[in-house]
């Protein structure tokens, strides 16, 4: 997990201040409620009077780590305080073998014989269910290796060209046929293409067919040769014309504890923003900036500043270690960070392995 360096004045807090601050944050993460000096005095490992605790809380408030939501209330951590807690106190453990087994079984089952979109949707749904937040998967445009191409005649002068990738994606295009093309020539053209494009990306397949132009002339008649050339040409620009897409599951989880209309509006804006192209680019950029899991709390990220949400995100990579997408959890700032970080990290690694 990538961690920024906390402010020196915060790092120099004495042990008593750290204990009180840690208990305030842990109480907030568990119950979402302010905690006062009397409750803290019962929770602290050393005996301190409520008056002493109030003095320490005043110092912590002055540092911007905690605040009082009401005049007579206890204290809650600020976003800066949560960041300090994550950087200085949080201990991220490993997932148990059982947790790893459950995640791996669910992801592998969703990918078996299914499309890439299906597997990523299931990953988003699973993260949502395990975290009680909203699961998010960003699928960037990738060039998956091709599996096969097929031509199906629709009319005497029209055919459906079907391009299937090894990740299960299927693309269809209608092409115009030269006059006189027979069904056997359609099969001959597709067989020739499949012999040379399997396992290559679309760009690589086009380069390979250009290199084999002379061999194509010798192996095929003119009509079949025309089909071979047209069969790949119709996907000109397809390497870059499919946009990245975002998959969000578990939106209802974010609404469970929301009662104020203003908070509902903030969440609505968040989901609207997440559907924009700019958000996709920004999220992928965030994932690419660090080697592992990244945590963004509230206003640390412009996309989530209005809703006061947190984002825990990790990239997943292809066989060449290029970032091809990201996945994570969006939720309230009182997420269980220590539990979710290893969950997101392991899921990202697993998805990356299955896509290779």
Swiss-Prot record:
UniProt-listed GO biological process terms? negative regulation of DNA-templated transcription
Question: Pfam families recorded for this chain?
Answer: HrcA
Keywords carried by this UniProt record: Repressor, Stress response, Transcription, Transcription regulation
MF terms from GO for this chain are: DNA binding
Which InterPro entries has this protein been placed in? Answer: GAF-like_dom_sf (IPR029016), HrcA (IPR002571), HrcA_C (IPR021153), WH-like_DNA-bd_sf (IPR036388), WH_DNA-bd_sf (IPR036390), WHTH_transcript_rep_HrcA_IDD (IPR023120)
Q: Which NCBIfam families match?
A: hrcA (TIGR00331)
| Family label | Belongs to the HrcA family.
Q: Record's PANTHER family?
A: HEAT-INDUCIBLE TRANSCRIPTION REPRESSOR HRCA
**Function, as annotated:** Negative regulator of class I heat shock genes (grpE-dnaK-dnaJ and groELS operons). Prevents heat-shock induction of these operons.
Name of this chain's protein: Heat-inducible transcription repressor HrcA
Native source species = Chelativorans sp. (strain BNC1)
Upper classification of the source organism reads: Bacteria, Pseudomonadati, Pseudomonadota, Alphaproteobacteria, Hyphomicrobiales
């Amino acid at each position: 997990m990538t961690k920024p360096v906390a402010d020196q004045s915060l790092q120099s807090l004495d042990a008593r201040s750290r204990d009180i601050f840690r208990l305030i944050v842990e109480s907030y993460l568990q119950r979402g409620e302010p905690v006062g000096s009397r409750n803290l005095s019962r929770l602290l490992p050393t005996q301190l009077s409520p008056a002493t605790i109030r003095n320490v809380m005043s110092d912590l408030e002055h540092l911007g780590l905690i605040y009082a939501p009401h005049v007579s209330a206890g204290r809650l951590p600020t976003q800066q305080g949560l960041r300090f807690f994550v950087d200085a106190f949080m201990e991220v453990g490993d997932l148990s073998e059982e947790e790893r087994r459950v995640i791996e079984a669910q992801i592998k089952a969703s990918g078996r014989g299914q499309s890439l979109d299906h597997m990523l949707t299931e990953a988003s749904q699973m993260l949502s269910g395990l975290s009680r937040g909203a699961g998010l998967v960003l699928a960037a445009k990738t060039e998956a290796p091709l599996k096969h191409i097929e031509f199906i005649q629709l009319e005497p002068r029209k055919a459906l060209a079907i391009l299937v990738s090894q990740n299960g994606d299927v693309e269809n295009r209608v092409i115009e046929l030269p006059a006189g093309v027979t069904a056997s020539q359609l099969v001959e053209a597709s067989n020739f293409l499949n012999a040379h494009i399997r396992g290559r990306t679309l760009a690589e397949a086009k380069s390979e067919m250009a290199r084999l132009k002379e061999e194509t002339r010798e192996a095929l008649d003119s009509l079949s040769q025309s089909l071979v050339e047209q069969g790949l040409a119709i996907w000109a620009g397809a390497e870059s014309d499919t946009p990245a897409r975002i998959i969000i599951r578990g939106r209802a989880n974010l609404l469970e504890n929301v009662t104020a209309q203003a908070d509902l509006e903030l969440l609505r804006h968040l989901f609207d923003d997440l559907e924009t192209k700019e958000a996709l680019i920004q999220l992928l950029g965030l994932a690419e900036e660090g080697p592992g899991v990244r945590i963004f709390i509230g206003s640390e990220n412009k996309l989530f500043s209005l809703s006061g949400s947190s984002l825990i995100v990790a990239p997943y990579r292809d066989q060449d270690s290029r970032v091809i997408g990201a996945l994570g959890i969006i939720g309230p700032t009182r997420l269980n960070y220590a539990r979710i970080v290893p969950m997101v990290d392991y899921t990202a690694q697993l998805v990356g392995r299955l896509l290779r």
